[in-house]
Amino acid sequence: KKAKDTGVLTLGHRESSIPFSYYNDQQQVIGYSQELMMKAVEGVKENLKLAKLDTKLMPVTSANRITLVQNGTIDIECGSTTNNLERQKQVGFSTTIFVIGTRLLTKKDSGIKDFPDLAGKNVVTTAGTTSERLLRKMNEDKQMKMNIISAKDHGESFLTLETGRAVAFMMDDALLYGEMAKAKKPGDWIVTGTAQSKEA
């Protein structure tokens, strides 16, 4: 209804969720989810028989994406948001477009092979994500005494890891591989650890 009435859809995108939705070097939003979202916009335009449907792009974070959909600030969110029962009670989801496991990114020579190796160490994850919730629960349940750092986005999480302020970055494996690919020396890094969840 909003698209038909206004001729505009506001699309929420991520700034650093490689390979799903992120800025390229020219500050254009690109990625797998972004491409799918633009196809969905074309579908809406055709279904509503609109001659023109404008789009407005708005950056969102893991912490605010659900709220911005709920309050109508954005019409569609395009990123790597996990479709789970808790979130289905809050917002609607498209059909599944990816399946991932939650793992660790660390330096190859860090000695970190799996989650038990994180006991007593600094670990970073991105605020507002399923990974953050899982990591905090693991820390409490297993009394691992990790110092958990919650960064604002995946780029900041990787920077925290890269600068040595954390020994590992816990996140969806596809996103970890994306961060690893853009590193100065991708060969210095490894995605490791038993997947803590399988998510879509």
Model-predicted segments: where are they?
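Extracytoplasmic small-molecule ligand-binding "clamshell" domains
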Residues: 4-77
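Periplasmic-binding protein-like
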Residues: 15, 98-109, 155, 173-174, ...
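Soluble non-cytosolic domains of exported or imported proteins
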Residues: 27-35, 60-63, 125-129, 151-155, ...
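Short, hydrophobic alpha-helical packing/hinge segments within bilobed ligand-binding/sensory domains
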Residues: 36-37, 64-68, 157-160, 166, ...
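Acidic, polar ligand-binding/catalytic clefts
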Residues: 38, 50-117, 194-195
